[in-house]
Structure formats: structure tokens, C-alpha cells
């Protein structure tokens, strides 16, 4: 079998149902990668560094020889690692469900898809089978679509796998990801002061078959000083962008497709919403769910009062400069006295002030913002109020 080189669009098309192997080093993969890819490093971080040094200080040929020294003894291990990954990956994946851009009729058969996308010919889908069945198709990429992916693809092809490699490698994928943020989207923004349950509203809309993008979920952060509590560590900026681009690309958006997001500042924890996408959000209608202060305070106390005091104190200290020395100390003292509600009252006043400033700091704000008066942090009731306001 021959190794096939395919474009990033075709690579992503097939990746919906096929195994993606990223053969870059563990450090490169950890920094950022194509979502749902598996790391099968041809070289570890130390080996990659040695090869790079040889390339810079000696020659390309010497660097290749170093690479062969590392690659040769590991060929069997690489193949066996792929077999283990395939065995785990195959569970639960039983059919090929190709989503091809431009084919609006779901009844189009595979032969039609082959005609439009020749790349899918002879694809063997992951399907739990006896050990004697034909090995499935595998997608392989490295940084620039060069020697690393070529070497692994050659080895796996030799062993019997059907292999596709990505033209331009991960770098081509990154260019594709950044292109997603330059597109125009028909956004609708769910707004509300801190403690309004906006994320719950967003996912309630999703359950009713509306398209959403949960920026805070992708960022592993709820946006405020307390937003990291209860969340896993944030991804890198690059990985956040990859996740966001993938999410946007899965929404079959036509110009009329509505996508709901929460109202956010450009910064979510340590991450930044890509500037072009954020500008698009700032031009979108905002449905501001206006809930009384005390109701939101009760909700916030219930949500965050369960966390250890030490973590709460550390979170408050991170905004000390903006909160002010006196208010910071008061908020911490209330925490130490187990008076969570009064501590959070100070924080909520602070965030209400800053949210109001950000809410109206957009062009044409008076026409974009629709105020929706609500009495409780109640997802079911507030979704109905949103519907009454013609979202």
C-alpha cells in the first residue's frame, strides 16, 4: 500500500472517525495538538533536542543519522504502541459517518462521497474485529509534514496499515484553526451579572437543539477571580484556540445559523479570546438577564462556599490591586470568620461595577442590549423569559 498525502480539510474530515497519531515529541504535544489526537512520539524531547543541535552545528545529513540511530531500535515498539492504541480506540466506533462540506443531502451514498472527495476511497473504519481482520486506516502528522511523519507512515504502511499523512503537518492545521476566527458568525450573547447562572442557560439552550459555544468550558475557567476553583488547569493559549476552532467548525453554520455564547471579557483566566472572534461577539445582540443582587449573592455563596478557605483567600488576593487593600482585607476577614456571604458580597459589588462598564463599552450598545427582568436564578423560568423576548 502507498502512503497518501492529504490536505488539512480532508485530514479533518477523516479525523471525525479515524485515529489521529501526532508523532511530534511529548513536549510539543503537551503544549498543543489537534483535539482527540494521540501522541506517538518518534523522538522524545531529549532526542529531538540532540537532532536539532546536530542540524544547526553539523549538517542536515548528520541530523538524519542521529534520527536513524533513535528510530531504528524503536521501530518494533512504535508498531506495538500503535496496536495498543488501535485496540483501545476501536471500542465503540462501529461505522463511518462522513460529513462532507457541500453535500446537503444525507441520503447521498458513499459512491457519491467518493466522487466528491476521492480521499475517502478504501478507508477501513475502526471496528472491533478479530485480530486477523484488516488493520484500519490511520492518520499521521508531525510539525510540518516532513521526515518524522514520513518515517512513521513508512513503517506503519510496511506493517500493513493504510496511512494518510497531513500535507504541511500541524503547522497547516494551525493556519486552518486561525482561519476559523476570521469568519463571520451569527452570534447571540447571553448576558447577566456574576451569579446569574449564564452557563446553565447556555446549556439549557443546547438541550433544545440550539448551537452553543461554551467558552468558559473550553477555557476551564469561569472568568472571575474564583473562576479556576473546581476546574482542571487551563490549557495553553494555543490549545484553547485549537479547541475553540474545532467547536466552531462542528457547527454547520450558514449565515443564518444562530450560535449562543456567554458574554465575556476578552480574557478568561489566563487565556484570551482570539481578537477577531471577540470583535464579532461585540457586534452581536446581548440578552441581558437582570437578576436581583441578593438572589445572585445567594447563588454565588452556594456555588463557591464549598471550596477550601485557603483557595478562596488566594483567589481574592489575585485581585487585591483592583479590589483595594481595605476591601480585600474585609473580604478575607469575613472568610476567616466563616461569613462567606458577606465576603462574596464585597466581590459581587466589585464585579457588578466592572461588568456594567464592559457591557456598555461596545458600539451601538443601546440597540444591541435587550434587558430581561428576572426574579430568580432559575434556569427553566429564565429560558422561558428569553424565549418571550424572541431569541
Positions of PLM-derived features:
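Catalytic cysteine-centered active loop of the rhodanese-like fold, especially the PTP/DSP P-loop
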Residues: 69-73, 78-95, 105-124, 135-165
Amino acid at each position: 500500500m502507498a502512503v497518501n498525502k492529504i490536505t488539512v480539510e480532508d485530514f479533518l474530515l477523516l479525523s471525525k472517525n479515524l485515529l489521529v497519531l501526532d508523532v511530534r515529541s511529548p513536549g510539543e504535544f503537551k503544549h498543543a495538538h489537534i483535539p482527540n489526537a494521540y501522541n506517538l512520539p518518534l523522538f522524545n524531547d531529549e532526542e529531538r533536542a540532540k537532532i536539532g543541535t546536530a542540524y544547526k552545528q553539523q549538517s542536515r545529513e548528520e541530523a538524519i543519522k542521529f534520527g536513524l540511530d533513535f528510530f531504528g531500535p524503536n521501530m518494533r515498539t512504535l508498531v506495538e504502541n500503535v496496536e495498543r492504541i488501535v485496540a483501545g480506540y476501536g471500542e465503540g466506533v462501529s461505522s463511518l459517518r462522513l460529513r462532507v462540506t457541500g453535500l446537503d443531502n444525507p441520503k447521498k451514498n458513499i459512491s457519491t462521497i467518493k466522487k466528491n472527495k476521492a480521499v475517502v476511497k478504501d478507508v477501513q473504519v475502526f471496528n472491533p474485529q478479530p485480530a486477523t481482520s484488516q488493520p484500519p486506516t490511520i492518520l499521521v502528522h508531525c510539525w510540518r509534514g516532513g521526515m518524522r511523519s514520513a518515517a512513521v507512515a513508512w513503517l506503519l504502511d510496511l506493517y500493513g496499515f493504510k496511512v494518510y499523512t497531513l500535507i504541511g503537518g500541524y503547522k497547516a492545521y494551525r493556519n486552518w484553526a486561525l482561519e476559523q476566527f476570521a469568519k463571520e458568525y451569527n452570534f447571540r450573547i447571553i448576558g447577566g451579572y456574576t451569579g446569574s447562572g449564564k452557563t446553565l442557560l447556555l446549556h439549557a439552550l443546547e438541550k433544545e437543539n440550539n448551537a452553543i459555544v461554551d467558552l468558559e468550558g473550553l477555557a476551564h475557567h469561569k472568568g472571575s477571580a474564583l473562576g479556576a476553583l473546581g476546574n482542571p488547569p487551563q490549557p495553553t493559549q494555543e490549545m484553547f484556540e485549537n479547541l475553540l476552532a474545532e467547536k466552531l467548525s462542528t457547527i454547520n453554520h450558514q449565515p443564518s445559523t444562530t450560535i449562543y455564547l456567554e458574554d465575556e471579557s476578552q480574557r478568561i483566566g489566563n487565556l484570551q479570546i482570539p481578537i477577531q472572534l471577540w470583535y464579532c461577539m461585540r457586534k452581536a445582540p446581548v440578552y441581558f438577564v437582570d437578576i436581583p443582587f441578593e438572589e445572585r449573592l445567594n447563588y454565588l455563596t452556594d456555588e463557591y462556599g464549598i471550596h477550601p478557605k485557603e483557595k478562596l483567600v488566594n483567589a481574592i488576593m489575585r485581585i487585591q490591586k483592583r479590589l483595594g487593600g481595605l476591601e480585600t482585607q474585609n473580604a478575607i476577614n469575613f472568610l476567616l470568620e466563616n461569613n462567606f456571604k458577606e465576603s462574596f458580597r464585597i466581590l459581587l459589588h466589585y464585579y457588578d461595577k466592572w461588568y456594567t462598564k464592559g457591557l456598555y463599552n461596545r458600539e451601538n450598545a443601546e440597540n444591541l442590549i435587550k434587558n430581561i427582568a428576572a426574579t430568580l436564578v432559575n434556569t427553566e423560568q429564565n429560558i422561558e423569559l428569553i424565549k418571550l423576548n424572541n431569541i
